Amino acid sequence: MPVIGTTLRELSQRGDSVRRLLRPISKVEGGPAWGNRTGSGNYIIGTHDGSPPSSDFREWRFATSNSSMRAMYFECWKEYGRGRFYLFQAYLSLFQVDRLKTEREFIALHCDPDEPDNSPHSTYKKGPHLHILVADHPLPHAHIALNRGQLEAVLSSPQSISNAIGLALHMIREEILDAI
């Protein structure tokens, strides 16, 4: 049974919730624009500035509150029954941008609620966790769990996972974006 499930009807309205979720780190007061992609049993919600630059949602970016950082956020929901979907991934990446507009992935906030229980790092990966990508080994591949002690509650609904991600975004804003 999927961990975080929802209906297609609820999912089709989730884009505005995602936009509001990202307000703390977005340059745009109301949050970034969003779009969806469907196909092969997937429902993707991605965020961007203006019009999406390509059909690949992993290339979409939005401006953050820090002019030297851009962000990418998407949610991948997979169909498991007629009109029923579960959250497979929720991924945020922050990219440091230099004067030449070259991007370097800086930090990532991931959530993989469908990670199998028997996988080696599932208790760290299922809930929101950080990857410090600009650090030396082993940090870029470490799953720094933010809610391990509250995992059951965090994974109980789309709203509860959004709340946990929202708290992590506030931390990222205060501890990283405002500090650089």
Q: What are the roles of these predicted feature ranges?
A:
Residues 1-60:
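N-terminal "first-domain core" detector
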Residues 8, 13, 18, 69, ...:
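Short, intrinsically disordered low-complexity segments
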Residues 146-180:
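Long, compositionally biased interface segments
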Residues 15-29, 96-98, 168-179:
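Hydrophobic, Leu/Ile/Phe/Ala-enriched alpha-helical segments that form helix-helix packing faces
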Residues 82-157:
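An exposed acidic His-Trp-rich patch
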Residues 38-100:
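Amphipathic, interaction-prone secondary-structure segments
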Residues 10, 29, 59, 75, ...:
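Glutamate identity and glutamate-enriched acidic tracts
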